[in-house]
Amino acid sequence: NHPESVNGMTHCCGHNAQSAALLGIAAALKQPHALDGLCGSIRLVVVPAEEMIQLAFREELRQKGIIKYNGGKTEFMYRGLLDGVDMAMMVHGMTKGSSVNEDGDTDLDFQALLGMNGCIAKNIRYKGKSAHAGGAPHMGVNAEYAAMLGLQACNDLRETFQEKDTIRFHPILMGANCAVNIIPDEMKIESYVRGKSLEAIKRENIKVNRALTGAALSMGAGVELSDRPGYAPEYHDPTFMKLAEDCC
């Protein structure tokens, strides 16, 4: 519902702040003697479609060959826009009070809340059988119920997620295309499985897929799981992070 969204899509993590920061960097580099002692060239770039949202739409673009990757950063590199770059620095908004801890790693809450986790992007499709909800519900298989059961099973897994892995599973239901008096025969879900390491992401994603599949079996429904690589976990260089904090 953002007033400047295009086709219902807009960035969600303060990209206006990132753009302002880039303009500030450009202005600083134009100051007298700012580039003294430096060689080479400096390129200021922004990454469009950086957030991995609208997964079904992006997967459609990928299937058509319009894009190769669902994430803007990965697509950016694939198209060669960082070719010839020897060193890159990223500017992004942060939670107030976040910092590098004594072990040289980012604080745990910062790692989780700032989205620095890696992720697997998931498209989930439950397939049931439509029937008249009032007259013959026994002839249908409710895809919505199967999806709800699958999400409940995933919620019951949360106590098995270890805090050190900062696992996050946050699905959204994409809705059913049917009337109120019809047993829904399809329900789509989009989600991520996020984590602090690739090992943790893969391990917990297996659990999630098992829960989603088990729910379909218990209801006599079908389920299609499509997992696509998202972003790898991000780790900050502690020395450079400290330098950036001191400069601020």
Task: Label each residue range with its predicted role.
Residues 148-248:
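Metal-dependent amide/peptide-bond hydrolase catalytic core
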